Amino acid sequence: MTTRFSPGALPVFLFLVFFLLVAGPLRAETYTVDAFGDSITAGWVVYARDGNGCVGCGGYEPALQSLLKSAGREAVVKNWGKGGETTDHGASRVDIVIALDKPRYMLLMEGTNDLLFFSEDTVLKNMTRMVDASLARGVAPILGTILPDSRGGKRITQTNDLLRELAAKKNIPLADHYTAVKDNWSSLTADGLHPNSAGYAKMAEVWFDAMKTIDLTPILMLLLDE
């Protein structure tokens, strides 16, 4: 099936391109991006603390903030990572965080701690709860795959396959951290599980690339028919 412009759509499309490239930066709206997850989001081992909605406090959050600023986006990235958290605990607090911040984007990445005690199906169930909670409040969720664990982590590949399927099913962006870092993980990790500074910078790039897939899609889909 060939995708084409609807009749009369081209002038509107050209106007929107002009608006986004010229007028958009002049009328930039500040919005919030919530980084939500476990100790990897919080910033351990590089920053040994939990996030509580803080800004510039650790993990990939400061690097992502810099990428957004360089791209001319008026965004504030807040760190809501909590060390040792399982997906069940994450799902129990995600509504509270969304209500507090009213973010535009929710960056969701958890599951590593679950695999010490629970099944990959438990991760899927609870990550689905987090995605649905975001969508129900009009927040754009982006789902992250979990990182390698060179200390002997098990079922990571199977879990990430389920997360990829979830993102496809919900039609939301996937930040595939595992694929991005697995070949060079030894140089990107501090302890085999948590990233080092270079690893967190790489994570920020993966999140940023996933965020870019959202911005124009709703506008363009209104202009195109199949």
Which role fits each region the language model picked out?
Residues 1-14:
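Bacterial N-terminal signal peptides that target proteins for export
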Residues 11-23:
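Bacterial N-terminal signal peptides
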Residues 28-79, 95-102:
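Serine-esterase "nucleophile elbow" of acetyl-processing enzymes
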Residues 29-32, 71-76, 101-107, 135-142, ...:
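Loop/turn elements at helix/coil->beta-strand transitions in domains of secreted/extracellular proteins
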Residues 35, 42-48, 82, 87-124, ...:
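Oxyanion-hole/transition-state-stabilizing segment in secreted/luminal serine hydrolases
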Residues 46, 52, 115, 148-219:
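Catalytic His-Asp segment of secreted/periplasmic serine-dependent ester chemistry enzymes
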Residues 58-65, 88-100, 121-130, 157-161:
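Alpha-helical scaffolding within the catalytic cores
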Residues 109-113, 130-160:
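Active-site segments of SGNH/GDSL-like serine hydrolases
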